[in-house]
């Protein structure tokens, strides 16, 4: 059973996240291993496995990028273990330039410049995310997979910038 079916949701990118959370809580209560403490060893093991599956499904579907990756996996794209890389040279050069800029910001410890950088990267991420949503809605799986690969770069860059922000604030 796929994760969308497990939560009673349609297998599409845009989901009702409130319904997801409510169903997660219901499933957790229903399959919590403690409820099977007096059961057979097989029942206890099944409850632990089901609980782990429910938790993994929830973690996957609640985050936009992992939800997109999972949806693409249902259409034959194994982005988690694939060897495909981003082939868009302009995008890769832009990422290299942004990484260098982040390194410069770290060296200068310029928190104002860092704040501006984080906002700019977030805008880039949001624009790509919207592009990906449209591609998924239109079943443009190849294009969506490529956009997810690009979003991974931006997500990693954003995370690095936020870590630097925390580091600079600790001073």
From Swiss-Prot:
Membrane-spanning segments: none
PROSITE patterns: DNAJ_2
Record-linked CDD domains: DnaJ (cd06257)
Any Pfam family: HSCB_C
GO molecular function terms listed in the Swiss-Prot or TrEMBL record: ATPase activator activity; protein-folding chaperone binding
Alphabetical list of PANTHER family matching this protein: IRON-SULFUR CLUSTER CO-CHAPERONE PROTEIN HSCB (PTHR14021:SF15)
Name the UniProt record assigns to this protein: Co-chaperone protein HscB
């Amino acid at each position: 059973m796929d994760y969308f079916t497990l939560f009673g949701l349609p297998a599409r990118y845009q989901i009702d996240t409130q319904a997801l959370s409510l169903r997660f809580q219901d499933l957790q209560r229903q399959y919590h291993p403690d409820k099977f403490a007096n059961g057979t060893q097989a029942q206890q093991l099944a409850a632990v496995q089901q609980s782990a599956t429910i938790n993994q499904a929830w973690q996957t579907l609640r985050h936009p990028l992992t939800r997109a990756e999972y949806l693409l996996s249902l259409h034959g794209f194994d982005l988690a273990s694939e060897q495909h890389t981003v082939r868009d040279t302009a995008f890769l050069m832009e990422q290299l330039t942004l990484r260098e800029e982040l390194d410069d910001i770290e060296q200068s410890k310029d928190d104002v410049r860092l704040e501006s950088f984080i906002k700019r990267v977030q805008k880039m991420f949001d624009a790509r995310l919207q592009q990906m949503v449209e591609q998924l809605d239109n079943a443009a799986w190849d294009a969506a997979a490529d956009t997810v690969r690009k979003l991974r770069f931006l997500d990693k860059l954003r995370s690095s910038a936020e870590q630097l922000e925390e580091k600079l604030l600790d001073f």
